[in-house]
């Protein structure tokens, strides 16, 4: 796999930024919702806590054994770990970016069962230990682009999805891959209460075309920064598809089903005019309510300090994945 020439050393986000509790800090500072209407400079000053030294420590995950293939390394400085695991979207635990870190400790990730079924010759069931032992793990430094026009760069640890699917032996009828998050309302407050969970229909579901799922970039992710994923980042296993918007990266997966027909996806069901099935990062196709031409890269400074940077087509992975969409109108199929 060719190194991604679009990544610069300044693009990768550092370990000290990953596990923040934003809501608690804002309350401690007495910052009200009205304060968030202040001009940009005031935002940067008020939210300078984002680069402070009094952040809670990152949760201690289990250390993982993994390789570091040169093609995925780039020797780049990393997005701080406390920001990557402290600034999250995981609506099952609340709508605020700090809610997942504050609330996801209730999720029991061991024991765990992941089933692979549908249009396969050999259905599989993996347990918690299989996720980290059955396949060789490798660290990959990937860009991550949220549909909300912010981005990070993260050293994920996992294995290519195509290796798992190959074991199940997809049949000739398989055209799509459907994913499903665990449904556990007793552990996930957003699944109990529509107000907490943003009014989405749960369990969260996602999908890919089979060729997208089989692409070498598509990663079943079990760790970050050398350790097992924390719950707020989708433990024990989540999907990373680096050329797509982050909401395609379904978390805490319990089911993978190969299908003949295109599967439903949560955000497309909720707002089909705003969130397409493909969700490829594209600076030329705006969200109906904001531009996608630029993005706010979250690094080691204050969250509103940083300069906006141009959004790259396919999040900088065009050389690797553009051929998947040859002849497809990316504006219509957003």
From Swiss-Prot:
CC per GO annotation: periplasmic space
Keyword Acyltransferase among record annotations: no
Entry keyword set: Metal-binding, Molybdenum, Oxidoreductase, Periplasm, Signal
EC number(s) stated in the UniProt entry for this protein: 1.8.5.-
The keyword Signal appears for this protein: yes
Co-factor: note: Binds 1 Mo-molybdopterin (Mo-MPT) cofactor per subunit.
Residues where Mo-molybdopterin binds: 88, 91-92, 146, 181, 233, 238, 249-251
Signal peptide per UniProt: 1-44
Main subcellular localisation: periplasm
Enzyme class (EC, first level): oxidoreductase
NCBIfam families per the UniProt record, alphabetical: PRK05363.1
Biological role: Part of the MsrPQ system that repairs oxidized periplasmic proteins containing methionine sulfoxide residues (Met-O), using respiratory chain electrons. Thus protects these proteins from oxidative-stress damage caused by reactive species of oxygen and chlorine generated by the host defense mechanisms. MsrPQ is essential for the maintenance of envelope integrity under bleach stress, rescuing a wide series of structurally unrelated periplasmic proteins from methionine oxidation, including the primary periplasmic chaperone SurA and the lipoprotein Pal.
Protein name listed in UniProt: Protein-methionine-sulfoxide reductase catalytic subunit MsrP
The organism of origin for this protein: Escherichia coli (strain ATCC 8739 / DSM 1576 / NBRC 3972 / NCIMB 8545 / WDCM 00012 / Crooks)
Top-level taxonomy: Bacteria, Pseudomonadati, Pseudomonadota, Gammaproteobacteria, Enterobacterales
